[in-house]
């Protein structure tokens, strides 16, 4: 502001007893006058500065003044100024103090439809039971309405052209749905404990991850016929113990598949949490997976966003936009990640293993739901799903 108004007189628009004192600490010169539309303030003084009606601005040469908006109802003021030939940035701006307020207003008034997959059981004798039960939910931010679109216990969900595919954990089926969330088909899975799914459009293949067998399978998206299968290592077979790596979620970019897991060495059940993400080359599918991210604690939700591999270090509640940038940190078990071009969405589940985080955090949040998160400012808003327990995946249909 001081640079733009260097050779001009400063005028404040809006006699605000809140915003003017804050703004005056940032402006290096004393304002020439204040304008305000409220007739009760006409020709009065505020802090030694004359208050005049907005029409006063129309008699000024635009190049001689710089207007700083100091009213919370800035949208109407901006409209008035633009309609009268003033240019944003050149002739006027909002007070720098409005940055926080405007972000709050943006988040408060934001609307988005967020698809949430929930893996809760419907059987109240099961540990992962919740009152609402699992399913695919639509959370409409704005009116803040929750609707269950499909009943079930769902893990990862992916949009593949005009269809969606979702892994149903209890039925051991892959659901195929249209974009209205009508079930088109259910494909039998050849084993329990499938979790992750991704779609590679050039090959028209679905990539499925099994958390017990630690396998990555390729299926034709039209017929669901299996094309190939990679076993992450021979450790499960040799030891006759399942889920030693605990592969879970997956994403794909062109020829490369990225899969997250609890332990690269296969020792997480022994307390060795060397979790991470490995890259698998589809052109050399049975080659050795290449670890690209290490040192994570039960990670989930790898996603390619803006050309970078983003992921969640779930137990620590950390969100990374690449392996060097810790973009956000949350006080719960983070799983489920999406981006709509403006905000990130990070899912959070009730933490069944809170004692493992004692001493590592000052707060352990037990709510299920998701955050709307601005990575630049670290501002967030939490949208609770109080009758659910486990959020697995988040999807934004329209970006």
Please annotate each region the language model reported:
Residues 297-321, 325-369:
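Loop/turn-rich, solvent-exposed surfaces of beta-rich toroidal or solenoidal domains
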Residues 111-113, 161-162, 202-204, 254-255, ...:
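Short coil/turn segments that connect the beta-strands within blades of beta-propeller domains
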Residues 189, 224-245, 289-296, 326, ...:
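Surface-exposed loop and turn segments in beta-propeller and other repeat-based domains
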Residues 1-105:
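Hydrophobic, well-ordered beta-alpha structural blocks that scaffold small-molecule cofactor pockets
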Residues 100-106, 151-161, 192-201, 242-250, ...:
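Repeated scaffold domains used in trafficking and secretory/extracellular systems
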Residues 116-131, 259-274, 347-366:
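Short, conserved, GDST-rich strand-edge loop motifs in beta-rich repeat architectures
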Residues 133-139, 272-283, 360-376:
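Beta-propeller blade signature
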């Amino acid at each position: 502001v001081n640079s733009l108004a260097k050779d001009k007189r400063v005028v404040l628009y809006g006699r605000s007893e809140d915003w003017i004192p804050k703004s005056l600490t940032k402006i290096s010169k004393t304002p020439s006058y204040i304008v305000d539309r409220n007739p009760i303030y006409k020709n009065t003084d505020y802090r030694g500065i004359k208050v005049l009606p907005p029409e006063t601005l129309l008699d000024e040469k635009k190049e001689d003044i710089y207007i700083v908006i100091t009213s919370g109802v800035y949208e109407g003021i901006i409209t008035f100024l633009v309609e009268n030939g003033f240019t944003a940035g050149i002739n006027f701006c909002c007070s720098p103090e409005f940055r926080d307020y405007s972000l709050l207003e943006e988040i408060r008034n934001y609307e988005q439809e967020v698809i949430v997959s929930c893996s809760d059981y419907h059987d109240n004798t099961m540990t992962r039971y919740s009152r609402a039960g699992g399913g695919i939910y639509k959370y409409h931010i704005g009116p803040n309405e929750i609707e269950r679109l499909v009943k079930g216990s769902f893990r990862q969900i992916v949009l593949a052209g005009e269809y969606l595919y979702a892994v149903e954990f209890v039925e051991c089926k892959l659901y195929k749905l249209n974009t209205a969330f009508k079930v088109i088909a259910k494909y039998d899975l050849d084993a329990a404990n499938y979790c992750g799914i991704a779609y590679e459009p050039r090959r028209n293949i679905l990539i499925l991850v099994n958390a017990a067998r630690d396998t990555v399978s390729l299926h034709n998206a039209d017929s669901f016929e299996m094309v190939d299968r990679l076993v992450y290592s021979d450790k499960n077979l040799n030891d006759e113990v399942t889920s030693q790596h605990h592969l879970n979620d997956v994403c794909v970019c062109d020829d490369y598949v990225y899969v997250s897991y609890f332990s690269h060495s296969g020792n997480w059940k022994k307390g060795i949490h060397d979790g991470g993400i490995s890259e698998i080359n589809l052109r050399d599918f049975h080659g050795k997976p290449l670890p690209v991210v290490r040192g994570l604690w039960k990670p989930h939700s790898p996603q390619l966003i803006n050309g970078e591999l983003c992921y969640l270090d779930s137990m620590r509640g950390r969100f990374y936009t690449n392996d060097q940038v810790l973009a956000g940190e949350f006080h719960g078990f983070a799983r489920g990640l999406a981006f709509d071009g403006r905000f990130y969405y990070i899912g959070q589940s009730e933490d069944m293993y809170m004692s493992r985080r004692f001493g590592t955090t000052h707060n352990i949040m037990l709510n299920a739901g998701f955050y709307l998160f601005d990575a630049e400012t670290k501002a967030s808003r939490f949208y609770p799903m109080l009758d659910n327990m486990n959020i697995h995946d988040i999807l934004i249909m329209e970006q």
